[in-house]
Amino acid sequence: LNQVSDAEKEFGGIRLWGTIGWIVAGQVVGFLALEKNPGDLVMTFKIAGAISLVFGIYSFFLPDTPPPKAGKDVSFREIVGLDALKVLKIKNYAVFFIASILICIPLAFYYGQANIFLNEIGMQGAAQKMSLGQMSEAVFLFLMPWFFRRLGVKYMLLVGMLAWVVRYLCFAYGDLDSGLWMLYLGIILHGICYDFFFVTGNIYTDQVAGPQVRSSAQGLITLATYGLGMYIGFWAAGAIAGANVILDAGGEVTNHHWDKVWLFPAMFAAGVTVLFLLFFKKSEKQDIA
């Protein structure tokens, strides 16, 4: 974000390339049929490791982004990023911050259980079909500036959270027969689920944080969401999925009561949405530094 002049207009186009990476990864897994044999899944880590090494080397050639206080004295508080905590003094941002942590709990259900769910119910090429979600994400990233001008931060975030509710209801009641459309809708909603909440959240954080703490503020929200929120979410997803297993006569897991598994994140996301609607009053665009 330090490299752009207008985050609302430019960030979506930059973030789009990350989405393209997700699409390519899903297509590669499907093309190589790595899901069919659990023993072949080790190849996914080898491919990911090789690509990560290439990008690690490439990162040395990225544009120089010296810290705002380069060459100046800095305090320990600034070094460890504690100065970013001042953004929480803004009431609306504090509400958004808490909602972000909470919404990552149901988010973890998708990341941790969706592929298992689709494979378990018999969907062929689940990883490839899940990349439809990233294709949807690419479309909405392109449309982000248009939605920003018409909806603003609050309603962008609300639409994103509501999409999580609808997605999990689709998974709870969808099947490979007459409910197949619900499964595809649940996958395709990823564009709204992710872009309208998390990408909007990154831009909102950029708006309320001053230039001196912008990077620290982004690090703080990332730690809170993908650290704390996702940790709780993956623990909850594993516990709830484990409590809803279907066993054969030999005690082996053959399936899950997926309707019960998906209803929990649907209800949780609905609760977070209601709380956000009540306590986030309006969009604030101001620097804190």
Locations of regions flagged by a protein language model:
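Intracellular juxtamembrane helix-capping segments at the cytosolic ends
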Residues: 1-5, 196-210
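Loop-to-transmembrane helix entry
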Residues: 9-19, 42-46, 119-138, 181-182, ...
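A membrane-interface helix-boundary motif in multi-pass transporters
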Residues: 31-51, 239-269
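Multi-pass alpha-helical transporter architecture, strongest
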Residues: 51-64, 258-289
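Helix-loop boundary and gating motifs at the non-cytosolic
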Residues: 92-131, 198
